[in-house]
A protein has these predicted regions:
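Long, low-complexity C-terminal extensions of enzymes
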Residues: 197-205
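Helix-coil boundary/capping segments in enzymes
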Residues: 2, 98-101, 185
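Catalytic alpha/beta core domains of metabolic enzymes, predominantly
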Residues: 39-45, 53-165
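Active-site beta->alpha loop and helix N-cap motifs at the rims of alpha/beta catalytic domains
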Residues: 1-59
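Interfacial loop at the N-terminal end of multi-pass membrane proteins
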Residues: 148, 193-194
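Conserved short secondary-structure transition element at the edge of the structured enzyme core
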Residues: 113-116, 154-192
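Alpha-helix initiation and N-capping motif
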Residues: 129, 168, 184, 199-200
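Short, electropositive alpha-helical surface patch
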Residues: 4-12, 66-73, 178-181
Length: 205
């Protein structure tokens, strides 16, 4: 997949570690990313690691990050951190100066940015990207923007609302109504299409 995407000359890709297998060692995770990067063979392509251990079952720790940066300093440039562990996120921003840490959580995005994080990559940004972008880009001017905290709370509320449903189905339902395009509702099991999203005020409202 990474090799095919690279053909389109994208600047960066977000890559999960190989998952399904339990008790994978750090060496195994490093070898997985090493093989992906070497087989793609694009010296210009940037890689953003994706740490979401509660879903993948694989945790990307300090040793993995450090070794991959040493092996591929021009390619491994950042990580989306979706573990929800704020202390760990802040340690990463402090320890790896040239490494871009992106919060995978809307509720933690502002705190991470204030402590050296690069921004946020979240599911919610598919439907409220402009709002999240404003929060991230203006976090240093928070005190001079009257409703800044309200905007942050709104972003979190959108996420909470989205995740009262199966999030991918809800995202697709929202986009199908927003763009009046039923192609958004194409979805594969075990995920199911949300029926009559126009009537679901929780999502559309």
């Amino acid at each position: 997949y990474s090799k095919e995407v690279a053909k389109f000359k994208v600047k960066a890709i977000l890559v999960l570690p190989a998952f399904y297998y339990k008790n994978v060692s750090n060496e195994g995770v490093i070898e997985f990313y090493k093989r992906v990067i070497e087989e793609v063979g694009d010296s210009d392509l940037k890689y953003i690691l994706y740490n979401i251990p509660h879903v993948s079952g694989v945790s990307i720790g300090f040793e993995v990050i450090e070794q991959l940066i040493k092996l591929f300093p021009n390619n491994v440039v950042g990580m989306k951190e979706s573990s929800g562990d704020l202390d760990n996120m802040l340690k990463i921003t402090k320890f790896f100066n040239e490494f871009s840490l992106f919060s995978g959580s809307d509720s933690l995005a502002l705190k991470v940015c204030k402590r050296g994080g690069a921004g946020a990559i979240t599911a919610t940004s598919n439907i409220s990207g402009k709002l999240l972008s404003f929060i991230v880009n203006n976090h240093k001017e928070e005190s001079s923007i009257d409703n800044f905290q309200e905007l942050q709370l709104l972003q979190v509320k959108i996420r909470e609302t989205l995740f009262t449903h199966e999030s991918v189905s809800a995202l697709k339902a929202f986009m199908s109504v927003k763009q009046d395009n039923q192609e958004w509702n194409r979805i594969n099991p075990p995920l199911l299409r949300m029926e009559n999203p126009q009537n679901n005020k929780t999502i559309i409202g």
